[in-house]
Amino acid sequence: MNTTANTTNIIVGLSGGVDSSVTAALLKQQGYQVRGVFMQNWEDDDNDEYCSIKQDSFDAIAVADIIGIDIDIVNFAAQYKDKVFAYFLQEYSAGRTPNPDVLCNAEIKFKCFLDYAVGQGADTIATGHYARKEVRNGVHYLLKGLDRNKDQSYFLYRLKPFQLERAIFPLGGLEKPEVRRLAAEFNLPTAAKKDSTGICFIGERPFREFLQKYLPTDNGKMVTPEGKTVGEHVGLMFYTLGQRKGLGIGGAGEPWFVAAKDLTKNELIVVQGHDHPLLYTRSLVMNDLSFTLPERPKAGRYTCKTRYRMADAPCELRYLDDETAELVFDEPQWAVTPGQSAVLYDGDICLGGGIIQTTDKPVIITR
C-alpha cells in the first residue's frame, strides 16, 4: 500500500468489478476519505446484450452503498471515442493489432478521470490494478504486482511521472484469491463476479460482428509463403499473428498459424507448425515511446514483454532517434505483433516502452 500521511482524500475508480470494490473498501477501512467514480465510456450500443455498463453501474452503486461512500457517475464517452476508439479502428484498418486497454489507461483512467478527481479536490486516485508503486528519493517507480498471474504493469507502461505521483494501487501486494476473500468479508455484491475479459469499457461481445459495424470487410486468399492457396479469409483485420483457431484449414499435418498479412494483395500468409521459422523474431522496432520515469532508460540490457502474461525476455535496447528504438532479443520471440506494445523492465520496475511497428520478418506487407 503506497500512500503518504497527507493523502487523505482519495477518489476510487469503481468499475463494478471485484478488484475496484475491494480497493475502495480497504481504503475506507484504513481511515481515508473515500469517494467513488463510475466511468461511463461507451454509448453506441449500451442497450445490447453484450454491453454490461448498466449492470456494472448498478454493482458499483451497490458497493458504494455497502461501504458507505458517495459515488458519482461521470461520462467520458466522447473522450473515449476520440482518443481510444478512433485509434483502435485506425490500427485495425492498417493491418495491425492494437491494445486498447493500454491507451484507455493512459487517456481515460489516468487522464480524464485523474483530471476530474483533482478538480473535485482529491489528493490522489486509486484503481484496482495489480501493480505496485514505490517512492525512492522523491521518484515514483511503477513495479510489477506481486501476483505474477495478475500483474497489470504491462497495461500501465504509458503512465507519465505526474500521473504516477497522483495514483495508488492498493491491490498490488495482494493475490487474487485474497482479494476474493476480502470481498466476501466486506460482504460486497461483487465478491463472486467474474473478471471482465472484453475490450476496455466495451464489454465481451463477438469481435468479428462488432468490428464489421465500423470497418468494411474484404475477403481474400489464405496462402502459404510459397504462394499456394489453402483457404479463404473473411477480412485481414479479423486475424492476428500467431492465430491458430478459426482459420478453417483442413487436411493432414500440423496445425496452421497466421504468419503475415499482405495488404497489397489482400492475402493472409499461413504456415504449418507452432515452431515454423516465420513465426519467430530476433528484433523489433518500436515507436511512440513512453516512459514512466523522469529520464528515459539508457540504451543497454533489459527484459521485455511483447504481450501480456508472457515471460520476460532478455533484450538489448538501442535508440534509433528520439521517438524510435530497436530491441534485439537474446532468443527468438514467437508471434511478435505490430500494433501491440513492447514493455521494458529492469527487474520488477516497469520502465515504459512503445508500439511495435516492424520486426525482422515481413509480417505486414504493404508493397
From Swiss-Prot:
Catalysed reactions, as listed in the record: S-sulfanyl-L-cysteinyl-[protein] + uridine(34) in tRNA + AH2 + ATP = 2-thiouridine(34) in tRNA + L-cysteinyl-[protein] + A + AMP + diphosphate + H(+)
Domain of life the protein comes from: Bacteria
Region annotated Interaction with target base in tRNA, chain positions: 99-101
Active site: C104, C200
Cell compartments where the protein resides: Cytoplasm
UniProt-listed CDD domains: MnmA_TRMU-like
GO cellular component terms attached to this protein's record: cytoplasm
Location (main, coarse): cytoplasm
GO molecular function term, any single one: tRNA binding
HAMAP family attached to this UniProt entry: tRNA_thiouridyl_MnmA
Name of this protein: tRNA-specific 2-thiouridylase MnmA
Lineage: Bacteria, Pseudomonadati, Pseudomonadota, Betaproteobacteria, Neisseriales
